[in-house]
Amino acid sequence: MVAGEASGDLLGAHFFDALKKNRPGLTAAGIAGPRMVEAGVKAIYPSEKLAVNGYVEVLRHLPELLWIRARITRHFLRERPRVFVGIDAPDFNFTLEAALKRAGVPTIHFVSPSIWAWRPERIERIKQAVSHMLVVFPFEEAIYRDAGIPVSYVGHPLADVIPLQAPTGAARATLGLGDGPIVALLPGSRLSEVDRHARLMLEAAMQVRAKEMDVRFVLPAASEAARERIARAAQGLDLPLTVLAGRSHQALAACDVAVVASGTATLEAALFKKPMVITYRVPALTARLMRKKALLPWIGLPNILARDFVVPERVQEAATPDALAADVLAWLGDAARRAALAVTFDALHRDLRQGASARIAAAIAPYLEAAR
């Protein structure tokens, strides 16, 4: 198994737990994060090594990434696993999967890259690399079927894990927060994302605080290194801020509004039925390249799935403290708009809640049996 960054680690843990239910003696090893390790996966390398994004950052880390991929490829070719599972991290995994598939190892890829949003030409590379694609959004299934790639729609594991009714009161009690308005700030799990978004979000929080004196802020840090950078970003700011060690789901359950860096966390916020502002910043060169290849007007998963701007997006030069603060204040001041959005997000949640564990186990079972 190979997973990249925090979201892949979480999905990888759910994936392996699903497989173990009917195969308690099953073992797995590869590139894994702490949640996968807790689920029983042996980490040959930590998944944080793959947590880089954007053309500029990838180029900076390219020698190490290529070295790790060469080493892990040799390891799997030598050990000959019954099945290989790549979880997200497509640019890393597809080359590895292609080598293993050529050697006769079945390759399962969990979570399709967003070929429907940009770089659709990747479908040909996927065809060479992947024995079976497991997709988490219903519209993705037809894309792979039309391309002649075996595919199963399994639903999204997070939709199964997150309750249909957000436990707001319990989360606030656990975190020691009061009854006043709470705004969650989620700058991203990668350190580069924290560097680009933490100060931006905190400055926006200062402006919100100036208009709403009783508001409090909660910010989950994905790692100790992220927590240290957040502390530096918050220096000199007088904010009622609670920084958490992880616990992003509790932060989202507790909040009234969230400011979220684009990524899986936007889907999590939607599953918790929370109004949000989606933001993202990347280096200017990366932004120019991505805009040229983009197929959709949205970047956030809630908007992509709704095919509409149901929540605001503030990207690149539009991502300013003024804009984020105005969006947060607009959500806080409009209960009817918040209630209407919750109805939209409830329907989305029910669509994605498919019992992913059972579907994953059923899709991969033939490959495990054939390799016995």
From Swiss-Prot:
Cellular-component GO terms for this entry: membrane
SUPFAM superfamilies membership: UDP-Glycosyltransferase/glycogen phosphorylase (SSF53756)
Catalytic activity line of the entry: a lipid X + a UDP-2-N,3-O-bis[(3R)-3-hydroxyacyl]-alpha-D-glucosamine = a lipid A disaccharide + UDP + H(+)
Enzyme Commission number, as recorded: 2.4.1.182
Keyword Lipid metabolism carried by entry: yes
This protein's pathway: Bacterial outer membrane biogenesis; LPS lipid A biosynthesis
GO biological process: lipid A biosynthetic process
Keywords associated with the record: Glycosyltransferase, Lipid A biosynthesis, Lipid biosynthesis, Lipid metabolism, Transferase
InterPro entries assigned to the protein according to its UniProt record, in alphabetical order: Glyco_trans_19 (IPR003835)
A GO molecular-function annotation: lipid-A-disaccharide synthase activity
Tagged with keyword Nucleus: no
Function text: Condensation of UDP-2,3-diacylglucosamine and 2,3-diacylglucosamine-1-phosphate to form lipid A disaccharide, a precursor of lipid A, a phosphorylated glycolipid that anchors the lipopolysaccharide to the outer membrane of the cell.
Family to which the UniProt record says this protein belongs: Belongs to the LpxB family.
Protein name, UniProt field: Lipid-A-disaccharide synthase
Organism of this sequence: Thiobacillus denitrificans (strain ATCC 25259 / T1)
